[in-house]
Structure formats: C-alpha cells, structure tokens
Design a protein with these regions (language model features):
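ABC ATPase "signature
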Residues: 72-76
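Catalytic Walker B motif of ABC-type/P-loop ATPase nucleotide-binding domains
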Residues: 15-19
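A short, proline-enriched helix->beta-strand linker immediately N-terminal to the Walker B motif
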Residues: 9-13
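Helical segment within the ABC ATPase nucleotide-binding domain
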Residues: 30-43, 55
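A short, surface-exposed alpha-helical micro-motif characterized by mixed small hydrophobic
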Residues: 57-59
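Conserved H-loop
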Residues: 44-50
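Short catalytic/signature loops enriched in Gly
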Residues: 78-154
Length: 154
C-alpha cells in the first residue's frame, strides 16, 4: 500500500500496477482496490492494472486487454469480456475464477498452445471489421462495438 501511495505523490497522469493485489489477504485486497477506485475518481488518473485475475479487474477497469505470450488476443469493455469472451485464453482466465455455487463449477483443464491454436475463432472478412494482421491468416478483428479479438480470417 505504501508503494501505491508513493506513486500517487508524483502526480503522474498514469500509474502502472503489476499484480498489486497478489499475496494480499481478501480484506487488504479490497482496501487496495477501494483506494485505487477513490484515487482514480478524485484525480482522474489512468491506471494500467496488470493481473491474471480478471475478477479483480472487473470492478476497477473500464476496458480489459488480454495478452497471451506477449500478444494482445482480445480487448473489449470490461462487461463485454465477462458477458461474451471470444478467445480461448480469455475464456480460460474467466473459467479460473472460483465459483461459490457448486453447480456452476467446472472441472478445470490445462490448456496449452495447441489447444489455443486449434480453438482460435474464425471469421469471414465479410462479417467483421479487419483491423490488423500478424501474418497471412491470423488477424485482429472488430467483432462488435469496441470488441476486438485475434482470429483466423477466412
């Protein structure tokens, strides 16, 4: 918490936080998130919050960008990510969030590169706005208003 407060003393327009709530108990984690929300509202501060726990980001972020192996694979407003995840890695991150209701729990499976590659979404150029390409077949496409995903363009 002291490191976070120290960053705000410099009056920076943006603060970058890398897993600031990891290894914190639930009460302290909630206090840190509440502090960040208050300071964000009061100072109009932009926060780049790096985390693999999407449930932590849900209450804090306006937009979520999901990266896998150094590549952006999905980006959308927070509620779109939670309501309609498209990329298999985004889906796996959301499935990793613990569920209180036993009927909603799924048996977790390990995903690897071959699973990701074989489950990349496929879209026709006629159905989406093509944004950019990494190679000849994989591109970054807009599938909905401000919802972008890495996909195979066919």
């Amino acid at each position: 918490r002291i490191s976070i407060a120290r960053a705000f003393l410099k009056d920076a327009p943006i603060i970058i936080l890398d897993e600031p709530t990891s290894a914190l108990d639930v009460c302290v984690k909630a206090q840190v998130i509440n502090l960040l929300q208050d300071l964000q509202d009061e100072m109009g501060l932009s926060i780049l919050f790096i985390s693999h726990k999407l449930n932590v980001l849900r209450s804090l972020a306006d937009k979520i960008t999901v990266m896998y192996r150094g590549r952006v694979v999905e980006e959308a407003p927070t509620e779109q990510i939670f309501a309609n995840p498209i990329h298999p890695y985004t889906k796996s991150l959301l499935e990793a969030i613990p569920k209180l209701d036993p009927s909603l729990r799924k048996r977790r499976t390990f995903i690897d590169d071959s699973f990701i590659q074989s489950n990349i979404p496929k879209y026709s150029l006629n159905d989406v706005n093509f944004v950019s390409t990494n190679d000849s077949q994989i591109g970054f496409v807009e599938i909905d208003n401000n919802h972008f995903v890495e996909a195979e363009v066919v």
